[in-house]
């Protein structure tokens, strides 16, 4: 396992697919990183030299928020929506879909089990 941006990346994967193991980097962002660093996309992670790994690390650090910072940022954004009391915040608080999806027949996973009390049981 090669360590890039504090994440263990599998050595047998192609570089763009290996970079997607980092939270906040998808396949299109990984392709942009490879192009910006001048690294061939068809190479495997195991074929990277230390110089290439350092180049990727510095590019990611300068241009993207990833891992813990990104998770904190997303959590703070959701928290501010909930505190504002806007529609999206209310949906987050109730555990319902936020982006306008249908809930009458779908969204079973998001809604969870119904918590209605059963008559005669306490």
UniProtKB/Swiss-Prot annotation:
Coiled-coil segments: none
InterPro entries in UniProt: Rbsml_uS13_C, Ribosomal_uS13, Ribosomal_uS13-like_H2TH, Ribosomal_uS13_bac-type, Ribosomal_uS13_CS
Recorded superkingdom: Bacteria
Protein name: Small ribosomal subunit protein uS13
Free-text function comment from the UniProt entry: Located at the top of the head of the 30S subunit, it contacts several helices of the 16S rRNA. In the 70S ribosome it contacts the 23S rRNA (bridge B1a) and protein L5 of the 50S subunit (bridge B1b), connecting the 2 subunits; these bridges are implicated in subunit movement. Contacts the tRNAs in the A and P-sites.
Keywords, sorted A to Z: Ribonucleoprotein, Ribosomal protein, RNA-binding, rRNA-binding, tRNA-binding
Family classification: Belongs to the universal ribosomal protein uS13 family.
Cross-referenced PANTHER family: 30S RIBOSOMAL PROTEIN S13/40S RIBOSOMAL PROTEIN S18, SMALL RIBOSOMAL SUBUNIT PROTEIN US13M
Assembly notes: Part of the 30S ribosomal subunit. Forms a loose heterodimer with protein S19. Forms two bridges to the 50S subunit in the 70S ribosome.
Biological process according to GO: translation
Gene3D superfamilies in the cross-refs: 1.10.8.50, 30s ribosomal protein s13, domain 2
GO MF terms, alphabetically ordered: rRNA binding; structural constituent of ribosome; tRNA binding
UniProt region (Disordered), positions on chain: 97-122
Biased composition (Basic residues): 97-114
Pfam family, one: Ribosomal_S13
SUPFAM superfamilies per record: S13-like H2TH domain (SSF46946)
């Amino acid at each position: 396992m090669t360590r890039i941006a504090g994440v263990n990346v599998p050595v047998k994967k192609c570089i763009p697919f290996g970079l997607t193991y980092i939270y906040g980097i998808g396949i299109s962002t990984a392709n942009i990183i490879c192009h910006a660093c001048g690294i061939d996309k068809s190479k495997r992670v195991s074929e990277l030299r230390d110089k290439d790994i350092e180049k990727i690390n510095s590019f990611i650090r300068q241009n993207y928020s990833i891992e813990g910072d990104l998770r904190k940022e997303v959590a703070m954004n959701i928290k501010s929506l909930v505190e504002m009391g806007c529609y999206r915040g209310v949906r987050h608080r109730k555990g319902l879909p936020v982006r306008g999806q249908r809930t009458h027949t779908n969204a079973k996973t998001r809604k969870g089990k119904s918590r209605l009390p059963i008559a005669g049981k306490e």
